[in-house]
Each structure stands twice: as structure tokens, then as C-alpha cells.
């Protein structure tokens, strides 16, 4: 059964000539890792912002566990590309920050923060300052902070976009490990086709003007990694390469159609 349901969702910003999104129908349930891919202007970030409750749809309905989404909530954890960490706090305090705002006792929130740091392989970094961390380590802290509140679903806005290729692949592997261990549904947006194909159980390709779902693919490469196959072996597999090229061709077709319009 779906935890998150989007029915006929549209988004139209004041002053815009056309809708940003139109007639989006989606569901997200247990053991799903849903990835949205598309060219700039296809509404990927707008879609995530609607699910997060940062903006209100102009049409349609978003529900989580049957209740309407009407604003941000702790049941939706968000990880951004710009991780928005607090540079004057150490790693432990950053991970525990949301719990502190929620009134959780210091001993409880620090215990939970340490548990999440273990999950993202950052034990021993508790007292480090944010400026002492690499880009990948900062994203691990951001992921741990989002998970500390025990959200029902995890929303990720191009979380690995600013990382180098080696660190990006490490973070992709870490995300799949966390996804497998926590069983939390994930909605992630990216510009990276290989990343999308590798991670997704469900991949939606968004077309622009207005943003709409052009394709919905069901994939199993991430599940294969979770079952013990290496990332390098999967990404070198002929089936993976063929799927990646098919998705790339679809993206180019969307861009060509946009230019002709």
C-alpha cells in the first residue's frame, strides 16, 4: 500500500505563462526508491517542494498515510545538495539539531545522533566542525540529520550533484545501504542518468513545458547491489548500459521536442 499519493497534481506560479507541473499522478510505498529525472525546467525540484509541503499545489491532492499534505512535517525528511549544516556546531550537534527543536532530551537526542552517525559510517567524527569535513562527509551528516527524526519517507534534492565522481559513487552505495537497512521509501531527483538508473526501483522521466511524466520505468539494478553485487559490476553490465542509453535517448528526444516547439 502506498504511503504517499499524488493525484492530478498541478503547479502554477504567479506570473508564469504556463504551469510548472500538470496532472502528476504518483505513489510511493515501502521498499521503493523513486527517482525523478529530466532536463532543466521539467519541474523536478518543484515536485519535491510540493511533496515536502514547502509550496501548495494549484490543483490535485497529495496525501501521506491518507492525510492531506498541507505544509512541512517531520514525517518527511529532506536532504539538499546544499546541506545547510550549522558551521558553528560540531557534527553531533548538527545531527541532533532537529531533535533539539522538537524538545527531545539531550541524552536521548545524542544517543539517536550517534546511532545515525554509525548508520552513515561517521563514528569518530562527532566532535568535528563542519568546515573540517569533505563534501561527501558533509552529505553523510545531512543524511544522518534527516534520518534522526525517523521520517516516514526521505526526500533528496540532487544530494550528490556537487561531488566528484568517486565520492558520488561512494554516496550512491551508502544510500542503497541505508535504504536497505531502514526500509524507508526514498524520492530523489537528479540530473545524472547513470545515477538514476543505478539507484531507482522506479524511474520517472519528466518532460518540460509543462512538467509532466513522460515515462515510468521499473528497474532492479539497485536491488542487485543490495543483494551483494558490486556497483562496478552492475554499471559494467550490458543490461545496465543498454538501459542507460535508452534513458539518455529519451532525455535527448525531450530536449529536441522542446527546441522544436
Swiss-Prot record:
SUPFAM superfamilies noted in UniProt: P-loop containing nucleoside triphosphate hydrolases
Keywords associated with the record: ATP-binding, Cell inner membrane, Cell membrane, Membrane, Nucleotide-binding, Translocase, Transport
Gene3D superfamilies: P-loop containing nucleotide triphosphate hydrolases
Enzyme class, broadest EC rank: translocase
Domain spans labelled ABC transporter: 4-233
Catalytic activities: taurine(out) + ATP + H2O = taurine(in) + ADP + phosphate + H(+)
Binding-site residues for ATP, renumbered to this chain: 38-45
Pfam families (UniProt xref): ABC_tran
GO CC aspect terms: plasma membrane
ATP-binding keyword on record: yes
Subcellular location: Cell inner membrane
Main location: membrane
EC numbers: 7.6.2.7
SMART domains per record: AAA (SM00382)
Family the UniProt entry places it in: Belongs to the ABC transporter superfamily. Taurine importer (TC 3.A.1.17.1) family.
Name of the molecule in the record: Taurine import ATP-binding protein TauB
Organism of this sequence: Pseudomonas syringae pv. tomato (strain ATCC BAA-871 / DC3000)
Taxonomic placement: Bacteria, Pseudomonadati, Pseudomonadota, Gammaproteobacteria, Pseudomonadales
Gene: tauB
Amino acid at each position: 500500500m502506498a504511503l504517499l499519493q499524488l493525484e492530478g497534481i498541478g503547479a502554477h506560479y504567479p506570473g508564469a505563462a504556463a504551469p510548472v507541473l500538470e496532472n502528476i499522478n504518483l505513489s510511493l510505498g515501502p521498499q521503493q526508491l523513486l527517482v525523478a529525472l529530466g532536463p532543466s525546467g521539467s519541474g523536478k525540484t518543484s515536485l519535491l517542494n510540493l511533496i515536502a509541503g514547502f509550496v501548495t499545489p494549484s490543483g490535485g491532492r497529495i496525501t501521506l498515510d491518507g492525510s492531506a499534505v498541507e505544509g512541512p512535517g517531520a514525517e518527511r525528511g529532506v536532504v539538499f545538495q546544499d546541506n545547510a549544516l550549522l558551521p558553528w556546531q560540531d557534527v553531533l550537534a548538527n545531527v541532533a539539531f532537529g531533535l533539539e527543536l522538537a524538545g527531545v532530551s539531550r541524552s536521548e537526542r545524542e544517543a539517536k545522533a550517534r546511532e545515525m552517525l554509525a548508520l552513515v559510517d561517521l563514528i569518530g567524527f562527532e566532535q568535528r566542525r563542519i568546515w573540517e569535513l569533505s563534501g561527501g562527509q558533509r552529505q553523510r551528516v545531512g543524511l544522518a540529520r534527516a534520518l534522526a527524526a525517523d521520517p516516514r519517507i526521505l526526500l533528496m534534492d540532487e544530494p550528490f550533484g556537487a561531488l566528484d565522481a568517486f565520492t558520488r559513487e561512494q554516496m550512491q552505495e551508502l544510500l542503497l545501504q541505508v535504504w536497505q537497512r531502514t526500509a524507508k521509501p526514498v524520492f530523489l531527483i537528479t540530473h545524472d542518468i547513470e545515477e538514476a538508473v543505478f539507484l531507482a526501483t522506479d524511474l520517472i522521466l519528466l518532460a518540460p513545458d509543462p512538467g509532466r511524466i513522460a515515462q515510468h520505468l521499473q528497474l532492479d539494478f539497485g536491488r542487485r547491489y543490495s543483494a551483494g553485487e558490486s556497483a562496478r559490476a552492475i554499471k559494467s553490465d550490458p543490461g545496465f548500459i543498454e538501459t542507460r542509453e535508452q534513458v539518455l535517448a529519451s532525455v535527448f528526444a525531450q530536449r529536441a521536442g522542446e527546441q522544436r516547439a
